[in-house]
Amino acid sequence: MVKNSLKISLKDQTATHKLGVSLGQSLPSGSVILLQGDLGSGKTTLVQGIGKGLEIKELIVSPTFTLINEYTSGRIPLYHLDLYRLEPEDVTQLHIENYWEGIEVPEGIVAIEWAERLGEKPLNYLHIYLTYQQQEGRIAEIVPICECELIDLNNE
């Protein structure tokens, strides 16, 4: 498993939103973003920025009660999931892997809030941990997870 991390200081909501816009502009279709952080840490703000980066015109709101919001008006579909109200065993019954596998829905970007409640994870994803620290504001730690083999450049 390939794993590195990048920490970004986000002084306010605007900075969190801008990070989301950058992600939305640069991530390819098929990307999965797992978001973790306390209430009010900026998960939904980040997803709203991703939507803006994808040129989605609709208002992006947290799907806390609907569980899944689908936005298809942008250049790539965005599937926004919120697992806050669910237990891990409930999550498996939703078959949300259909979203990252592109089964029954067009391939898009999948953003999952409260990802710690997710049982089975995709093979490749960005794990973003959002924390709030008194002095620094929000911190986003971005960890790309890749189940891929490294190429041995020494082997001919």
Task: Describe the predicted segments one by one.
Residues 43:
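Conserved lysine of the Walker
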Residues 40:
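Walker A (P-loop) phosphate-binding loop of P-loop NTPases
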Residues 33-35:
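Hydrophobic anchor at the beta1->P-loop junction of P-loop NTPases
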Residues 4-6, 97-156:
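Short phosphate-coordinating micro-motif centered on Lys-Gly-acidic
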Residues 2-22:
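N-terminal pre-Walker A segment at the start of P-loop NTPase domains
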Residues 31, 57-61:
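Conserved post-Walker A coupling segment in P-loop NTPases
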Residues 61, 70-114:
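Conserved nucleotide-sensing/catalytic segment adjacent to the nucleotide-binding pocket
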